[in-house]
Regions:
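Histidine/cysteine-enriched polar flanking segments
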Residues: 1-152, 157-260, 267-352
């Protein structure tokens, strides 16, 4: 069977701007098997998993399970598990860590404060090597296991601080992963590329190759960030920030296609509700034939204006449009063919 990752690669689908969105990550060690919905389908008490999901909802915190690479026998004994909190916004990224014996204690965290970037001194600061989290949950998509688990194992053998993670979206970009402290995700990754990404993160930099975007931002903003970085060849992780993002009327016909830059995909903070979710391949009904009326097929494409600032004082207005005009591909293994939504960068204009 042709996999979703193979189909996406063959279609040269852009990976930029498809990262999972999370201003703050809560990563909870859980050995043993993971189900499709890992927080409630693993050896974690499902009542705790559901409560964590509810506590994080709408706060900017994303909860995921992690485990060390390798075989995952789980004898169900009550043992201390490693937990991480990581805030990925460029103003002041941080990682906190602890070992907890009862995961229900995590429900005492102030999720709203954590999502806003305030850890209030909880747990201990993490000051070790950059952390790599590789998506490996084969119950969600076989590509994550077939491609992700060997990569995670190879990274662990090489000495990287590698973990497996339940779900970060974008199965068809497997092997896919993100690196902390900066929260940039990568797709179609190889071991040499990840090792370079870790070395770059150690120096406060990112890689532009195979980069899906920074999880702190929604998809239009991810696209805008990467477009500016490509334009000025900026790799310092915290040199770029997103100042503002808003939905705007689409450009006039003709201008939109003439102005497309790199095809970087993304979406931005305040307009998250209007943007496709984190590389899951939300399909645009205007172009997939799923529209219920002819009028919808002619609906204007969602468009955003994103203001991007450099710490040296420069800034740009980046116009980003949602499109679904690529080669039909499955968004995950076994799903029907469709045209996954992408973010097209139409223009990058300097301000001031």
């Amino acid at each position: 069977m042709r996999t979703c990752a193979t189909a996406s690669r063959d279609a040269t689908e852009p990976v930029a701007g498809t990262s999972a969105t999370a201003r703050t990550w809560l990563l909870v060690e859980q050995t043993g098997p993971w189900g499709t919905e890992a927080l409630t389908e693993s050896h974690l008490d499902p009542r705790v998993g559901r409560a964590l999901e509810a506590a994080a909802d709408g706060t900017g915190v994303r909860v995921a399970l992690v485990r060390r690479p390798g075989r995952h026998a789980d004898c169900h004994r009550s043992a201390a598990r490693r937990v991480f909190l990581a805030h990925t916004a460029p103003s002041r990224p941080w990682i906190r860590t602890a070992a907890v014996t009862g995961p229900e204690a995590l429900l005492d965290l102030d999720f709203a404060r954590l999502g806003a970037g305030e850890h209030d001194g909880v747990w201990d600061p993490y000051d070790g090597e950059p952390l790599v989290f590789v998506c490996t949950n084969g119950k969600r998509d076989r590509c994550c296991a077939v491609l992700g688990r060997p990569l995670a194992a190879e990274l662990a053998v090489s000495g990287a601080e590698a973990w497996e993670v339940t779900h970060i979206g974008g199965h068809r970009f497997s092997p896919t992963l993100f690196v902390l402290p900066y929260g940039y995700a990568y797709g179609r990754a190889s071991a040499p590329l990840v090792k370079d990404a870790v070395a770059s993160a150690r120096e406060g930099r990112i890689l532009l190759d195979h980069c899906r975007g920074r999880s702190a931002w929604e998809r239009p903003a991810q696209a805008a960030d990467l477009a500016v970085r490509e334009l000025i060849r900026e790799e310092r992780a915290d040199a770029i920030d997103i100042v503002h993002s808003e939905a705007v009327p689409p450009p006039h016909d003709g201008a939109e296609h003439a102005g497309e830059k790199t095809g970087n995909p993304s979406r931005a903070g305040k307009d998250a509700k209007d943007s496709p979710r984190e590389g899951e391949g939300t399909q645009d009904p205007r172009r997939t034939g799923t529209a219920s009326t002819t009028g919808l097929l002619d609906a204007p494409a969602p468009t955003w204006a994103v203001t991007v600032a450099h710490r040296d004082g420069r800034s740009w207005r980046v116009t980003v449009e949602q499109r679904a005009d690529g080669t039909p591909t499955p968004v995950s293994c076994g799903s029907p063919l469709g045209r996954p939504a992408r973010m097209a960068v139409l223009s990058v204009l300097p301000l001031g």
